[in-house]
Amino acid sequence: ISSVRLDFAGDLSRDEGERPARLAALREAWGLPVGQPFRQADWDAATQRVLDALSAREYAAAAITDSEALIDPATASAALSVTVDSGPVFRFGPLEITGLVDYDRSLIERYRPPTPGEPYSQERLLLFQNALQNTTYFASVVVDIDRHSATPEAAPVRVQVTEAKPRRVGFGFGVSSNPGYRVEPSYRDAHFFDRAYNLVSGLRIEQRRQLVYADVFLPPSLDGALDSVGVLAEHTNIAGLQTQRQSIGVVRTLPSGNIENRFALNYQHEAL
């Protein structure tokens, strides 16, 4: 490689704020310096890395408007030039949600969507998408923005969901040396009482132990708190000793960064 020319146009080319430092970082990260052997695969990867680094934050519509690798067989050299147009600065706008049937849009709003006016970030969109995808409510989730929006300062956040089947019935069977046989039917309802409450319930019947349980998990509150309530009843008959146990409890989980604080209140009654 005999020479490299890396030009930028659009908002990023303005000599204001943090733009010069970001431009310098992009030039520093360029992966094909002068003197390095030229390979087409490396050239393609280097231009894509520049575009990805730029479009990942603020400049969602960034595009390569010109790229050229002039090969001189006589001198066995390559002169490289790339022009990248950052486009305008993008900020998140209102949610545009499609695909909801059973659930209300307020359910999606509980999973911390980007705030209108917040600078665009691909990582922020992925965090929001993963939060929705990891629930029991949706079979698939796609979150993106309108990169051709006429209002990049308030680009709509498009949320496309496919709802999962809310109700599921399961059945398990097993045999082991200690409790003997085991039969366990279960029932789950992610739209319990038509309120997006997630019911997880089951009946476990073993040769020496019987258990019935039900837990209800509420969707997160607007501040991220997770609440749940559960009940359980158990009967055992081991070596002629019969026991009865009933339990009811409530749990609140409060996220704080990477730490979860869990507060629980439980009442339990046991009898022989």
Spans of features found by a protein language model:
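Interaction-mediating elements
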Residues: 1-157, 164-166, 180-182
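Gram-negative/organellar outer-membrane beta-barrel architecture
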Residues: 13-25, 118-272
